[in-house]
Curated annotation (Swiss-Prot):
Residues 275-364 form the CS domain. Gene3D superfamilies: 2.60.40.790. The keyword Cytoplasm applies. It comes from the Eukaryota. Pfam families: CS. Coiled coil: none annotated. This is NudC domain-containing protein 1. PANTHER family: CHRONIC MYELOGENOUS LEUKEMIA TUMOR ANTIGEN 66, NUDC DOMAIN-CONTAINING PROTEIN 1. It is found in: Cytoplasm; Nucleus. GO terms for cellular component: cytoplasm; nucleus. It comes from Xenopus tropicalis. InterPro entries: CS_dom, HSP20-like_chaperone, NUDCD1. Residues 259-278 are annotated as: Disordered. Keywords: Cytoplasm, Nucleus.
Amino acid sequence: MEGSNCSLRVNRQLLDPKFESYKLSLDPLPCYNVELDAAVAEVCLRDDQYTLDHMRAFGMYNYLHCNPWIPNSVFYVDQLERVMSFTVTLDTAMGKPIEVFRFPRDLNTCDSRLCSSMYFASAQWVTLSDGTGTLYIIRIGNQSGSVSGKWEIMFNQELGEPFIVVHSVSSVRDELHIIDVLLLSIEKDESDIKGSGFHVCLEWVSIARAQNEDNGKYEILKRRKLFGKSVPHYAAIEPLGNGVMMISYKPFRFIANDKDQPESSEDEKMDEDNKREPLYNWHQTGEDVTLTFQLPEGMTKEDLTIKFLPGEIDISLKDQGTFLKGQLYLDIDCESSAWIIKEGRSVEVTLTKREPGSTWAELVIGDKHGEYIVDPTQTAAIAEQLMHLTSEDMNPNPETEKPPCNAQELEECDLFLEDSTSLCRFDGARLKATHVVNLGSNPYLFTFVATPELMPCFALRHDVDALLWQPVSEQADNLWDHIATFNALGYVQASKQDKKFFTCAPNFSYSALCECVRRIFIYRQPTPVSTELYNRKEGRRVGQVAKQQVASLETTDPIVGFQASNERLFVLTTKKLSVIKVNSTD
C-alpha cells in the first residue's frame, strides 16, 4: 500500500502499570424507561445479505444516534418513518420522544432498503439517509439546540444504490459552504469469483453552496469512491475535508472521477518496472553460486572487470560504469571463484561458497535486478525432506493425537485473525494514502466522539489496556494523539462473547458495553476512596479503586441502540428507551 509507514506514540504518563482489577460494586444505578409510540424501524438482513461484511455493516447497526453538540440528546427513526428526538432535562420527569422530521416518501416500497442513518455534521447541519439511496442535508433552524428546532431540507437527491451515512463534516472553504459526507454500501462484484462476490464501497460526496447565498441551492461538488474487500471498523473525514482516515482489515483504493478504473499509482508503476527483463540470472548448488548475464554488443573480454572479495563482488563495464556491486549474502572463496565468456556472449561467474551446504536467499543483499533460477533437483530434495510435515489429506480429528493447545483455554484475543488491519490516511487531492499504521497487534475496539469539532476518536487494544486515540489532522508529524486509557479494558472486553455495542463517556470517566439482550457492564476510572484500604499481599495502602457495575434491563427485547453521555447511558430496544444514570451532574 502507498504511504509512509507510521506508528502510534503511546503516552506513558497515561498508563498505570500497577493497576490490579475492577472491583464489583453493588451501588444501585437508577434506570428510567420510556415507552415508544412506534417501534424502531429495524431492518433485518435479507437472504442475499449473507456475508460477514453485511452483518458488520447492517446487522450490528446502532440505531440510536447522538448529537455531540447537545449533551443527553439522542435520535432514532421509527416505523412511521419519523426521526424522533429525545432529550433529558430532568431525571424524575422524563418526557416523550418528539418528532423532528418525517421522510417525504414511503420507504417500505423499496425491496433493497437498508436501515435509515444519520450523522450531525455540525450543531446546525445533519446528513440523513432514508436507506433507499436518497441523501438528505438538513438544517436545524433553532441554533440553541432545542429539540423543537425546525428541520429544513436543504438538499435531497437519489445517489444510486442504498447506503448508510458513516460520517460527515461541515466547513467553509474558498467562499463555499461545503458538507462532506461519507457513505457506505456493499455492492455485488461479478469479477470476484473466488471471494464473497461483493465489495465494499465508501463514497465521499462533497455538497456545496456559495457562502453568501443564503437562498442558493446546494449542489454536488465532487464524488469520489473508495473500494475495498472489508467493512472498515472506522472511517471519518478530516474537519476541513482535506482527507479521510480509515481502519480496515483489507486495503482500500480510490476510484476517481466516477470511473471504473483506478488512477495508476506510483506502486503500480513500480510493479511495471519490476516486470522488465532481469539484468542477470543466478542459481546455486551446495558448493557454489553461478551468475549469468549477457555482454552488451560491441564489448570484449577486455571491457569487462570483475573483482572478488570475501564478502563482496564488483562487476563493471567499460564506458557504462558499475553493472553489479555490493555485499554478498555469504562469504566466498576468492581463489576458487572464476568467470568465463561462453558462446553467445554469455558471461558466467562462478562463486565458490566458503560454507558448503549453505543456502543463499539472495545474491547481493538488497539488489532486485536479478532473477533466481530454481534447480529442480534441489526443489525435489527439499520437498522430500519436508514430506513428513505435509499431507494431501485433511486431518479429520486433530485432537486425537498431540493437540497443539487446549481450544477451551483460548480467548477471543488469542483467535484474532485480522493481523493485517491497518490505519490509513488518504489525501483528498491526490487520492492516495499518505500515512499507514499497521495495527496487527492492536485490535480495534470502538469509536466515539469526544470533541464535536474534531474527528471521532477510536479505541485500540494495547496489551491488556484500551487506549483512546484522537486524530489530529493539523499535526503532520503525529496525526494521532493518545488522550486516555482504560486499564485492563482490552482484556475485559475479550471475555464478553455476547457483547454488541461498546462506548465510553466523552470525559472518559467510564466505559460501557452491552450484550445483545438485557445486560450492560460499566467500568469506571479509578477514583479515591473515602476510607483507607490496605493490601495485605503487597503490604501497601490503596488510595483509589476502579469499580465495575452491572445493569440489567427489565425487557428481553434485543438491544438495537447504545449511546453514552458524561452522566447517562441510553439503551434502545425496539419498543423502549432506557436511561441509566451513571454519574451525577458536575
